[in-house]
From Swiss-Prot:
GO terms for biological process: methylation; tRNA wobble uridine modification. It catalyses: 5-aminomethyl-2-thiouridine(34) in tRNA + S-adenosyl-L-methionine = 5-methylaminomethyl-2-thiouridine(34) in tRNA + S-adenosyl-L-homocysteine + H(+). It comes from Yersinia enterocolitica serotype O:8 / biotype 1B (strain NCTC 13174 / 8081). This is tRNA 5-methylaminomethyl-2-thiouridine biosynthesis bifunctional protein MnmC. The keyword tRNA processing applies. It is found in: Cytoplasm. In the N-terminal section; belongs to the methyltransferase superfamily. tRNA (mnm(5)s(2)U34)-methyltransferase family. Its cofactor is FAD.
């Protein structure tokens, strides 16, 4: 999916104090009463708030064209909050709101517009606090303690709609067909939009729009909606509403199919790291029943147990799935970690910024490639040596790229706190449970443990065991590698304590953690090695990398490794550096079912859905980027298991599918060589 730069909205204000789009020459809402217009046209036009009480599911999905000032969303949120307060035991507990916006407003303009509606102030303030950077693609925002999911898709709706994942098909309960008037914004109002609305709507899904233009009515009818004209708001004579009478058949690539979990009331998670904890929380937020089994006596004893880890996006300037995923993952992670802190979840951290140095020609070439993209300066910006040094507090010796929203946090603290939070929310934990075997018996998964020697059974299982993922018979063919990494703990000095930012070079160095007066410097990279003993040569290599990359300044000589303080963990890595998240693919069945796949596609044969192990899911291959990727992959997995809309486009989701390496070869008619993952 191509992600062109996003231009923010340019506003003026008319005599009535209503914001006007300079791009479209049209007002954002009625001069008479924007709030009443929203309530009449979009909520009442779709049968809300009365439909809340009649909704048959626990989640109601809305979609909108033109987020604008967020007035429609804020009004709906207010009405839903009132409904929940009056009907706490109702079936409906969550809202999912999907909106497309080509020219997002800046926060200051949002704040100015929101002053018109003091009754929405508490909701508007929360929205502005989470307002995303102007980056193309989807920004998932969790509000109201997870009861409301807002997916803001920035970009041209006609470009975005064809690239949406099939998880949005037959999902939308109500469409708010907003945006500027057809005469002012003719490019939006076309058959691409109308057909996508029908494809995404559930049977019985509705729409409402302020316009009664004939070509809009005809386009929606042709797409499959039953359309009616009703009295318009205020001085407008007519508006349109409608309903989709029957489900529309939709198509997607069957080889990247993402099956949901048939039941979510008995889920076992195997693992004890950060992605296990975040997956548990994402499932619990959806009212799942979760039991976690961890081989260790405490959480965060593996790769998630480090004292400090850097958080920053992985950019490459290629606008490919890797960059799109990690840009989305980073911004989602920062929002989620900040929300956790606001909730009182404590973990050592500093949002101090991260500087990536151009320490040699190769790294300079990579950074120059990254900077060819017109990034918002709040995400990434080119900096000279002098600028980076002023920010870092020490001479950085090189120019480079600066990530102002990055920083460091303590993975061990965070994981432990998240596990405790999950238990408070109802998760059952069993530590000291060493899983040795998974067996499918009578429609259930049998979990066979060696320590203690007990068997458990669950309907659904999520494997989140890091580098141990390939140990099970169902996952042994996944192309994963174990990579040992030793992080050195360095006592601070008066000079080193001046470092105010994380420095990344051919390694990384963190600022001092005030809690222990140490820095972290790392990390070694030993593929295929799962031992975690201290090694003096790796300790020395961590120091030497810093000295090699910054040879012209003296302060790195202050790094003292003589006390041999370090921690070693084992990462789960993969060749393309992207996580694996989704249903566990059935290796043998995939090869048998997709033999001669190109010919079958060419001849138009029916292609069956990708074979997977039933009710068995996984999340892994986070490598050394788990702090960045774990929150989003946990959200992706939970959304898949519950059959909800995904926060990424089709191409990027396919690049995360655990079967992707096999499918790519099969689509080219090439053989898939059987291999067992590198464990030791």
């Amino acid at each position: 999916m191509s992600h062109p730069p996003i231009q923010t909205a340019t506003l003026s204000w008319n005599e009535q104090g209503t914001p006007v789009s300079e791009q479209f020459g049209d007002i954002y809402f009625s001069n008479e009463d924007g709030l009443e217009e929203t309530h009449y046209v979009f909520l009442k036009g779709n049968g809300f708030p009365e439909r809340f009480a009649l909704h048959p599911r626990d989640n109601c999905v809305f979609a909108e064209t033109g987020f604008g000032t967020g007035l429609n969303f804020l009004t709906l949120w207010r009405d839903f909050a009132q409904f929940r307060q009056l009907h706490p035991a109702a079936k409906l507990q969550r809202l999912h709101y999907i909106s497309f916006e080509k020219y997002p407003l800046q926060v200051a303009d949002l704040a100015a517009a929101h002053q018109r509606w003091p009754e929405l102030a508490c909701f508007a303030e929360q929205l502005r606090a989470q307002w995303p950077l102007p980056l193309a693609g989807c920004h998932r925002i969790l509000l109201a303690e997870g009861a409301i999911t807002l997916d803001l898709w920035f970009g041209d709706v006609n470009t975005l709609l064809p690239q949406l994942d099939s998880s949005l098909n037959n999902q939308v309960d109500a469409w708010f067909l907003d945006g500027f008037a057809p005469a002012k914004n003719p490019d939006m109002w076309n058959d691409v939009l109308f057909n996508a609305m029908a494809r995404m709507a559930r049977p019985g899904g509705t729409f409402a729009t302020f316009t009664a233009a004939g070509f809009v009515r005809r386009g929606l009818q042709q797409a499959g909606f039953d359309v009616a004209k009703i009295k318009g708001f205020g001085q407008k004579r007519e508006m349109l509403t409608g309903i989709l009478p029957q489900r529309l058949n939709t198509q997607s690539e069957p080889w990247y199919h993402r099956p949901l979990a048939t039941r979510c009331d008995d889920i076992a998670i195997i693992g004890g790291g950060i992605v296990s904890a975040l997956t548990a929380l994402a499932l619990l937020r959806r009212s799942a029943k979760v039991t976690l089994y961890c081989a260790d006596a405490l959480p965060a004893q593996g790769a998630s147990g480090n004292r400090q880890g850097a958080l920053y996006p992985l950019l490459n300037g290629k606008n490919d799935a890797l960059e799109i995923f990690f840009t989305s993952a980073f911004t989602f992670a920062r929002r989620q970690y900040s929300q956790l802190l606001e909730q009182g979840i404590r973990f050592d951290h500093q949002w101090c910024g991260v500087s990536q140095l151009a320490f040699d020609e190769k790294s300079r070439g990579k950074i120059n490639k990254m900077l060819q993209t017109d990034w918002p300066p709040q995400l990434a910006a080119a900096m000279s040596r002098e600028q980076l040094s002023a920010l870092a507090g020490l001479d950085c010796a090189h120019d480079g790229i600066h990530y102002p929203a990055g920083g460091w946090l303590c993975p061990s603290d965070l994981t432990t706190a998240l596990m405790a939070l999950a238990q408070q929310l109802g998760m059952t934990c069993h530590y000291g449970h060493e899983l040795c075997q998974l067996e499918r018996v009578d429609g259930l998964w049998q979990l066979i443990f060696t320590s203690p020697q007990v068997n458990r059974q669950h309907t659904t299982v999520v494997l989140a065991t890091g580098h141990r993922l390939p140990e099970w018979q169902q996952t042994q063919h996944l192309p994963l590698s174990a990579v040992r990494g030793q992080v050195s703990h360095i006592p601070t000095t008066p000079v080193l304590s001046q470092l105010r930012q994380v420095l990344c070079y051919d390694g990384y160095l963190t600022p001092v953690n005030p809690a222990n007066q140490h820095h972290c410097i790392g990390a070694s990279y030993q593929r295929g090695d799962v031992t975690t003993d201290f090694r003096a040569d790796e300790q020395q290599e961590n120091r030497d990398r810093l000295l090699r990359c910054l040879p012209d300044v003296s302060w790195p000589q202050q790094v003292d490794i003589s006390d041999n303080q370090a921690r070693c963990g084992v990462r789960c890595a993969i060749r393309d550096h992207l996580p694996m998240v989704g249903a566990v693919p059935d290796y043998s069945a995939t090869l048998a079912q997709y033999q001669d796949l190109p010919r079958k596609i060419q001849h138009g044969e029916d292609i069956p859905l990708a074979p997977v192990w039933p009710e068995l899911f996984m999340v892994g291959a986070l490598g050394s980027r788990g702090l960045c990727s774990a929150p989003l992959v946990a959200e992706i997995l939970a959304a898949q298991m519950f059959g909800e809309p995904q926060p990424l486009d089709t191409t990027t989701l396919a690049a995360l599918n655990p079967n992707r390496f096999w499918i790519r070869k099969l689509l080219k008619g090439r053989p898939v060589q059987q291999r067992v993952s590198v464990l030791s």
